């Protein structure tokens, strides 16, 4: 219907002039977005700026339907994406995994956006390329590539919600064979009181305040024309201020990657990465050792691309050494496992309008002695203004060291026991998507795209907990186990329009239905209907002055979770950005425009107490005239 309306307004041209970014996550090889047979969502740098997002949690919540962040029992953020919990979604930074977890979720505070150029999201299983945890999807944060000789940006942002401050500095230079990117970000926020401490209905009374410091360095060196070496390092520190104690979260990460280009599509990539994520608890400034946690991962990765006639072949292998020491193990002892995998992929254009990609991968995990072979087959048909994508993908998640070996006394209420006999979770994902795109001519010169996707994900042997009675080996508590799975199916619609007048708009709607035992483990009953939309206006008013305005909305239908029956809601956000003399950017934001206030705060309720305001200033020092 939208396409017909646009046709009536101006007429459809045969080609599109919208930006067509190159993506890497769906196939592990650079490929134009319009040519990728696997449905991929890209959130570009302009979108990141428009949303005024601080971290990946803010960005995904604003841009994607079918996704919701709530809170775990630890009062740390927990993700539900398309009916899957955080441990079924694989988060990557430039294609590399992250160590550590907070109640089955990565620490989303680590994923700030200070040096991110785009975010690529692949929904559905992707284990045939990425192995464990890619059961429900992959979210890959790609670093930006600065091409100027040097850049220097300083920025600061204040939010009335919790009197929050975010300050950052980003510097890059390019000289001869060297390129460098350095990013520093510091943020702090006060505790926000959501409900009265005696509110017996609310599960969540406060959002705890704290501070975050993050430093990242990325150094690129080209010793010869065809060889690129990429060294990186990062430091992260977060404090979460609770009533009687403070939790500390620290991460140290480093890596080295080499890419040699043989020419004509042939290249070899070899990398090593190390990531250490630690947690500890302090009372009155003193380390208690009661909640010590340390996860250390060493990963070696190799990838080889080889064109053979019409075929593009990809071969890869990985090795990971995973060590975990935690207060949830007996006597804080450490456990270790290694995993190894090998995979292959073919990519062929059988006809100018037909592309087929197939992948096969085998993984082995030593602790659970789990073997998993997963496959993916995707096809794309395209002709003028239309494309059809269809895919099958297998997914799996091996039991974690925590799920295998936990022996944890939960403050005297119950025991939680690991299970060395756990089997790997498995999934089968099916996708079918139709896309139509074109140009508009006439009074609304521009372009548009419409995508309609149906999906079904059958999840089996999922890991959850079951009651265990008192016997010679156990006290009363919970035991990790495998149980019957869940089927998640749905429909997603995306529509975008962009005009040369500076006006643009986008709407995304998701209908989701989950059947099976979806109330336990990482699943909660997902909301059936969700939608995001935004209307934007971008205009150069004068030579040294331009504006960008945006109004966005996020709608979520009522929760079907009997334990957390949150009502339907919508939250609106207005953003105004002014750019002066190419160097200064001043941003004003009104969030929760219509002052929505939940009456009861469940773990999946939006943590807002009404309208809040923020203002930010960003200065590109390199663009100033000295």
Regions found by a protein language model. Name each.
Residues 20-49, 78:
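N-terminal periplasmic "start-of-domain" segments of outer-membrane beta-barrel proteins
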Residues 22, 558, 566, 576-626:
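C-terminal beta-signal and adjacent terminal beta-strands/loops
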Residues 57-96:
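Extracytoplasmic beta-strand/coil segments of soluble accessory domains associated
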Residues 96-123:
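Short acidic/polar hinge/loop motifs at secondary-structure boundaries
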Residues 140, 148-152, 157, 170-249:
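Periplasmic-side early beta-strands and strand-to-turn transitions of outer-membrane beta-barrels
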Residues 181, 216, 220-238, 248-372, ...:
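Face-selective signature of the C-terminal outer-membrane beta-barrel domain
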Residues 269-283, 382, 389, 423-481, ...:
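Membrane-embedded beta-barrel scaffold of Gram-negative outer-membrane proteins
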Residues 349-356, 449-459, 479-559:
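Gram-negative outer-membrane beta-barrel transporters
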